[in-house]
Amino acid sequence: MGRSRSRSPERRRERRRSRSASRERERRRRERSRSRERRRSRSRSPHRRRSRSPRRHRSSSISPGRLKDRRDDDKKDSKESKGAKERQIAAEDLEGKTEEEIEMMKMMGFATFDTSKGKKVDGSVNAYAINVSQKRKYRQYMNRKGGFNRPLDFIA
């Protein structure tokens, strides 16, 4: 039998190694992305959380009892600071005012007609986006498995 014209086995191995390193990397990356996809549910419907508030992750370092204490402290602090603010405004702004102005300030609850633009304001003053109209969303039924070619349904 004649001698093979292909490269020697040593060189063939070296070349295979250099190719396989990049292939191996690519294959690992694909496997990782596949395993991530498998973890997700197979449902196509958008995943909705029950509450619209952002998720809060608990840190394991604080015990539930400690968390409750901290909440109580925060509530006390906020109540005290609100009362202090009102008293502080009244004490400073009462100087140099007539009795009518003082009476009106007490009745209205604020001292001046200064703008609140660009300032942080406590309370429900910031509830400005109540009546936002959103575009209607439709659920797709056509061109999908089990859709029976029925038209798009409105999602309330």
UniProtKB/Swiss-Prot annotation:
Pfam family, one: SNRNP27
Biased composition (Basic and acidic residues): 66-98
Keyword Nucleus: yes
Keywords: mRNA processing, mRNA splicing, Nucleus
UniProt-listed GO biological process terms: mRNA processing; RNA splicing
Superkingdom of origin: Eukaryota
Subcellular locations according to the entry: Nucleus
Region described as Disordered: spans on this chain: 1-98
UniProt biased composition (Basic residues): 13-59
InterPro entries, alphabetized: SNRNP27 (IPR013957)
UniProt KW Transmembrane helix keyword: no
Described purpose of this protein according to its UniProt entry: May play a role in mRNA splicing.
Family according to the record: Belongs to the SNUT3 family.
Designated name of the protein: U4/U6.U5 small nuclear ribonucleoprotein 27 kDa protein
Organism for this UniProt entry: Xenopus tropicalis (Western clawed frog)
